[in-house]
């Protein structure tokens, strides 16, 4: 369960004062990932590419304590678990939202991913774990290549968010440009940079 904490009791105290009421507290980083290993595993094990990337996102975030905090309204909340959100095309042709609880067991994460994305697609009902988990949002624009995307500050959803398009085939590798948006109250640029480095490392050693 999430619980409200006093920002003054955390390392985010000064960031809370500086950024909670800023006109636009969201920051976006851009990075090109080498996803060659994910392509190989996807083909070898017949696993979905986006599932593998979501798994690596959860694993990369899990060791960074800032990912267990999130500003919600005027409060700073602390979580015990992380979930990764994926957008699903449902049976009506529209999109639904599906949160997958992160586990460091790839087989279990894959089972949950397949089970709940199919369920959401059929029922057209979102699966929301935000009451219990700090959710990392993701969106895959698979119809085209994109260089990046900058989100907007809604003032409602402060969750970290990643977006990507099609991966790009190079001579000896596959590249994937990604955008990572985060709330400055939750983390600083150094934490976001560490996460993106972790993400590349997790992709390489999966």
Segments the model singles out, each with a brief description of its role:
Residues 38-63, 176-195:
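Acyl activation and transfer enzymes in specialized metabolism, enriched
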Residues 130-143, 160-197:
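Histidine-centered acyl-transfer/condensation active-site motif
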Residues 147:
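Active-site cores that bind ATP or allylic diphosphates and position pyrophosphate for catalysis
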Residues 6-8, 20-52, 68-84, 135-136, ...:
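Gly/Ser/Thr-rich phosphate-binding loops and adjoining beta-strand/alpha-helix segments
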Residues 48-54, 58-70, 75-76, 92-96, ...:
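Active-site loop/lid in soluble adenylation, ligation, and acyl-transfer enzymes
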Residues 1-13, 22-24, 36-41, 58, ...:
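Domain-scale detector for complete catalytic domains at protein termini or as standalone homologs
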Residues 90-144:
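Helical lid/core segments from catalytic subdomains that handle acyl or acyl-like groups
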């Amino acid at each position: 369960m999430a619980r409200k904490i006093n920002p003054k009791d955390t390392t985010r105290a000064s960031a809370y004062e500086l950024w909670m009421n800023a006109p636009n507290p969201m920051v976006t980083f851009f990075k090109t990932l080498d996803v060659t290993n994910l392509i190989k595993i996807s083909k070898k094990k017949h696993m979905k590419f986006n599932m593998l990337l979501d798994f690596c996102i959860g694993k990369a975030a899990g060791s960074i304590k800032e990912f267990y905090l999130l500003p919600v309204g005027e409060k700073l909340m602390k979580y015990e678990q992380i979930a990764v959100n994926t957008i699903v095309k449902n049976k009506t042709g529209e999109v639904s939202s599906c949160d997958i609880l992160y586990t460091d067991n790839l087989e279990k994460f894959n089972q949950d991913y397949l089970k709940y994305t199919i369920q959401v697609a059929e029922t057209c009902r979102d699966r929301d774990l935000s009451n219990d988990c700090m959710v990392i949002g993701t969106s895959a624009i698979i119809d085209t290549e994109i260089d990046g995307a900058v989100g907007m500050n809604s003032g409602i959803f402060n969750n970290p968010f990643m977006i990507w398009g099609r991966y790009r085939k190079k001579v000896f590798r596959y590249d994937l440009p990604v955008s990572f948006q985060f709330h400055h109250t939750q983390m600083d640029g150094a934490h976001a940079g560490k996460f993106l480095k972790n993400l590349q490392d997790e992709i390489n050693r999966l």
